[in-house]
């Protein structure tokens, strides 16, 4: 790459540098010319004259070293032009023999390593010798004295002629400032006048070097007069060309004067584009695009407008860009939607495990599609925690229905124009992302995945969620209007699938979508997903062969329990990938194994080179990061096992109560939220209202305080579903009857002792099963939710729906406190015990809901 001054800053300001005043006239050279031995700075594409101040950019190593040597001495340097600007490493033969002695006025090192230097030409120098010395060019030469063989009157006449011509040149050349003439008026010396004018005329570099080499002032002035006169002739020729073009234009076309001038120049060069051919091509594309009649009319009107414009005008570029976008819309192109339900079902099952509700909805749509010719695409919203496969499910749906897939991330979008586009009046306007993606995919009926639709926001530029109201309304999206296209676009055949982590979506927008909830995966589902999909995927991704590694189901189960705490499977996949990477390293360090030493399993199949199981899992993943809750081993007074759920699943939650001397206060600890505190107050009121029936002293609060504590105090907790657990704990403390350790419970309590419904039942039952609980008491109103509980959970747990707190106490305490009454529901299904044990702790900092 060519360096400047190694090159100059171009333009008039390079020679008139207002920040640095030009020094006064220097005294005449001495009678004996000085013999110079100075660093040499080779120049490319520039000739520096005496009395000229110019900034230069220096980037070559030798040139920068020459400047360093000059700055270390008296700041003088020889500026010599190269014969060829393409020479990167010039030697003596590559330089002219006449240069300029210059003084360095200012030097600045730039961030990119180059140097910007301001120099002033002092005098002409004949360079006799150039050698390389200390990494720089060093030159020996002699200052050249100007000669004047002509009469002073003749020289003065030539100088006046030159000044007159240059004034004419400056007036017709807009690139030169008028202030330059004022500077020249103050110069009396003819030689200096010539050296000041020479850099400002647009002649070849060779002519400027020739001016530098001429020592006779009169001869130099005469050559300069000829060069300036020639430049004036060129300017007059340009003016005649402009006049000829202008005379050929009609009055209505005068506003396109500059564009017509460019056309005339192109015509002279024979380089005019085939504009009529392009217009015919656009007309053909419009006819073949299959546009609706109103759209085709709009396109033809824009094309006619384009024909009347100059091809080089800015407006023509806007119209041409608009037609390109309009023609890019797939007006009639579509893919054939697959109607084979069996193939679609197999495709969905091959990519995702579980998610039966979503798959059922897609198959229903395909079944109806096979009977109805014109059917609007469904608008689904998949709501679930991160990592459960919402986005990848959208890809599988597109694959199953044979639609093209388009993903549009809505996270962080604040501008309505991202959806509807910008109007064409704005510079750089574009269609919205819907139209852009339709053009990109080239299909009228793709699957649009609107990812993270709950992450949109609004600002002064508009509300993008409001713009989506028309897009996601099946009754309106057949005439969607983009601000840029300004024509109706039919989106009714597009299948929209939105994803969201929560229902924090504006109500009108949520109402237009069919919400399908995707809950977190159970432990069994995670195990199946890992063994079927994640392990084979990571084995392949890390360059392993199936016979080189075997990850057992017990290892996957331990990863789920002790190394991840999530609703989805993203971290599970990361841990599997970590194991695969360590196995790859282990195999690489061990080196190739001899064929004779390869073990063979009992069934004759080759045994895996590395086997990962629960016993050696810590070798690959380190110490366990999490523990899961487990049932207490012994029945205790005042300690009851409740159930809670978080964003990453269910948890066992202990509730402890005790009596301490006091004045009847209720003490609550364990980072309880407002709802949970109110639930504790309600529980105490229930106990006091039933005190006599339960055999409790009605005045038990006269000299005692009741302290209720929920362990794991660093974790905030809130919710009403620990109400019956608090009642049971208080009754146990007051009656001294232990609570069964194998019973867990969840339910809200009312002042009348009724057990109300709760949420998160599935997650809570999974936590109970995992923690070794045998019996779970749930509100009777949640009986309907048992249909969504996995079969293995309902089979291995004894789930008892209850309506009143009396039933809870009869089942949870070691011995009943109240006689059994007919009419109370006592449904107790027998079930085998489970042997799943662990430790009860929540993830630190996780807010627990009850």
Curated annotation (Swiss-Prot):
It comes from Xanthomonas oryzae pv. oryzae (strain KACC10331 / KXO85). The keyword Protease applies. It comes from the Bacteria. Keywords: ATP-binding, Cytoplasm, Hydrolase, Nucleotide-binding, Protease, Serine protease, Stress response. The lineage of its organism: Bacteria, Pseudomonadati, Pseudomonadota, Gammaproteobacteria, Lysobacterales. InterPro entries: AAA+_ATPase, ATPase_AAA_core, Lon_bac, Lon_bac/euk-typ, Lon_lid, Lon_proteolytic, Lon_Prtase, Lon_prtase_N. GO terms for molecular function: ATP binding; ATP hydrolysis activity; ATP-dependent peptidase activity; sequence-specific DNA binding; serine-type endopeptidase activity. This is Lon protease. PANTHER family: ATP DEPENDENT LON PROTEASE FAMILY MEMBER (PTHR10046). Residues 819-850 are annotated as: Disordered. Residues 634-815 form the Lon proteolytic domain.
